[in-house]
């Protein structure tokens, strides 16, 4: 018998998550605890409910730049090794409880050195936290593998150094590199040296592109930088024309992305909050899925969007009428696009994802 498509059953479904920011997924209670422990005095609210509401409301700005301002508070309490370890471990526990079986969680080490930690200290603390979180999830009967993407801030000038850090820690759980931050005025081509370094090291990278800026950002990420995946990439829809009869006509760039099977790390709720799309109903996710782009479902920032992978999937089901087979396809898309070795990806697809959905499909 096919399981009902509700939040409870979707939570049971195995999921793969490619785009989730560590500093965007803290528990509100943890933010309060860490603020007290570290002496951070700038929080806009002092109880869990009010703080969670503030983050969601502040993130609902319709502007990527204003959305990013909310991170001052989470980053502000993540300046010690113990804080980073706790946040990383809780991240894994929360994802596992939501049915995520594989995740690539990204963070920018350069944002966590204000209190004296080195970049290596930051990496050590986060990776140890992930490992402890995996062990705690396993003890609770949840199977999850978490790896990390080491992120450089696109407005800064440390991307080559951060790329080297990603390669240095690639045998300890860092599976790739990323650049993030405001797109407008900070094109990915400012960081060509970092991307060339990653390619020469036979390492993988994704680029935030096509979220707060349009097709030029996507074009540069693919044509000049050689991105393996696109963080968001939602504005690729601007290169697709829909004729009077409903037929889609792809431009050169959108055709290239589809032909090359470039994974799109789509984050529906976040895209509405930042103004990339007006509403979930206006999100091009369904169009891109029907045109067989490699679409994936992601959370982006669970605290700011008050979301989980299960909630993101449910919102897509409610908006576009998807069934279990669609959710399985999006999950397999994500797992195929992960930055871990092929045999590990295949094992998770064959041994975890397909059997898990088979039970739900009936």
UniProtKB/Swiss-Prot annotation:
Active-site residues (renumbered): 211 (proton donor)
Residues under site feature: Important for catalytic activity: 232
Keywords on record: Hydrolase, Metal-binding, Nucleotide metabolism, Zinc
GO biological process: adenosine catabolic process; hypoxanthine salvage; inosine biosynthetic process; nucleotide metabolic process; purine ribonucleoside monophosphate biosynthetic process
Keyword Zinc included in the entry's annotation: yes
Gene3D superfamilies named among the record's database cross-references: Metal-dependent hydrolases (3.20.20.140)
Keyword Hydrolase found: yes
Gene Ontology CC entries for this record: cytosol
GO MF annotation: an example: adenosine deaminase activity
Cofactor(s) demanded: Zn(2+)
EC number: 3.5.4.4
Co-factor note (free text): Binds 1 zinc ion per subunit.
Catalytic class of the enzyme: hydrolase
Listed SUPFAM superfamilies: Metallo-dependent hydrolases
Annotated positions binding Zn(2+): 19, 21, 208, 300
Catalytic reaction(s) noted: adenosine + H2O + H(+) = inosine + NH4(+); 2'-deoxyadenosine + H2O + H(+) = 2'-deoxyinosine + NH4(+)
Binding residues annotated for substrate, in chain numbering: 21, 23, 181
Residue runs in coiled coils: none
Stated family: Belongs to the metallo-dependent hydrolases superfamily. Adenosine and AMP deaminases family. Adenosine deaminase subfamily.
Function: Catalyzes the hydrolytic deamination of adenosine and 2-deoxyadenosine.
Name of the molecule in the record: Adenosine deaminase
Record organism: Mycobacteroides abscessus (strain ATCC 19977 / DSM 44196 / CCUG 20993 / CIP 104536 / JCM 13569 / NCTC 13031 / TMC 1543 / L948) (Mycobacterium abscessus)
